[in-house]
């Protein structure tokens, strides 16, 4: 049996587009062609990979629908916020350019029912 891996990249809106690409593949390809043995990702792709890993083989279309709903909800939230003291505060005091608490809260809420695999 062949071992297929699905690697999901990161980068701004790319993670959002992965849901549409996965939905398109799931609706046009035979389930045996869609079968993969491993899934991984970085940044937003890792969020998608964790969500996808919680769906059994053959339910990639359902996983893609969930991804789309999740990323649609992110559009109403500014996921990264500036520090009150600006970039200087971020670099000198906080250890990062932006306050990422909003993205952490969003991921925690959206992935609350996803179990680690």
Language-model features and meaning:
Residues 111-117:
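A short alpha-helix-loop-beta-strand transition element characteristic
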Residues 1-7, 12-110:
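Patatin-like phospholipase
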């Amino acid at each position: 049996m062949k071992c297929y891996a699905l690697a999901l990249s990161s980068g701004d809106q790319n993670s959002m587009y992965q849901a549409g690409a996965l939905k398109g593949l799931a609706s046009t390809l035979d389930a045996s062609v869609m079968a993969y043995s491993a899934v991984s990702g970085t940044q937003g792709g890792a969020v998608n990979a964790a969500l996808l890993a919680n769906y059994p083989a053959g339910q990639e279309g359902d996983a893609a629908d969930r991804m789309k709903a999740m990323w649609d909800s992110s559009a109403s939230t500014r996921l990264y916020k500036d520090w009150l003291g600006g970039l200087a505060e971020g670099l000198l005091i906080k250890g990062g350019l932006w306050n990422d608490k909003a993205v952490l809260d969003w991921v925690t809420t959206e992935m609350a029912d996803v179990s680690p695999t």
